[in-house]
Amino acid sequence: VPEDVTVIVSRLMSIFTNAPYDEIYNDACEFYSELAQGGFISYSDEYVEWSRDSYFSYANNALVELPKVETDDFAYDDVFGEIQQLTRVQVDVSGYCNEKCVHCYIPQSCKHGLMSIDLFTRILEQCRDNNVLNITISGGEPMINPDLTEFLNLCGKNNFSVNLLSNLTLLSDEILRVLVANPLISVQTSLYSMNEDIHDSITGLQGSFKKTIQAIRLLHRHNIPIQINCPIMKQNKDDYSDVITWAQSMNIEADSDYMLFGCYDCSKKNLKCRLSLSEVEAVVTSQCESGAYVDKLFTEASNK
């Protein structure tokens, strides 16, 4: 929701009581201009009636050219001093999951329990006291928790940006309304293949492909920022790139990775699907032969 900078400055005046108004105002304008240049906020000299379409739109979405920073020009201690700033906290609000992904690092015996509103509220209070900026809500599957919409609303009331990690198979109209109403919420999901049988064989849930695809299209229609992850494993190594191509056709951010890790009970039972060294070599070789992949690497390198 848009807010006039003078209103923000008035609140800052009650904190920085010894600083003159003009100094705080100029510093605030400079700070918000830098955030706007980085794509973190929308900032204008004129009042604009907010709508999600004007804040973020897949039709108008384009890569933001961030200013190049040389390593020698930036040192963490020079900027933040000796105080180590915590900026992001991940909160797993559900131990349960309706999928049984073959590569999941959470042992099946550990998939239980739901977080209460009281505990979530106390976590947010501590995050606010420590100037945390982003809350990542995950699980298990967070949409199994019946209090998810309340969690999201609490994050909104406390001005946290939110990254919601979900398989999206349980997306409801109630949850969708909350996502649409808050421009600070983005969604991250996994799509393993454009082949329904392959995707469902990985998730262990029949019909999960159709539900996830349908939910992605619905979020896309409402201009809710989505990121698609596509882990590469034995089951999808020959067609994972179709997921990336499909996502790019809709201007959705997507990425793939062949790194899989064992369960956190130190077992390796989920690693049967991990690529062998020769399969990793084949995947990397194929990617390097792709002009689009090489262009992406050059772009990422130039922005570092």
Language-model regions, residue ranges each:
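Long, charge-rich, low-complexity alpha-helical segments
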Residues: 1-87
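Hydrophobic positions in alpha-helices of CheY-like receiver
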Residues: 12, 127, 151, 155, ...
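Alpha-helix N-cap/loop-to-helix initiation residues
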Residues: 17, 144-145, 172, 208, ...
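Flexible, glycine- and charge-enriched loops at secondary-structure boundaries
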Residues: 21, 110-117, 205-209
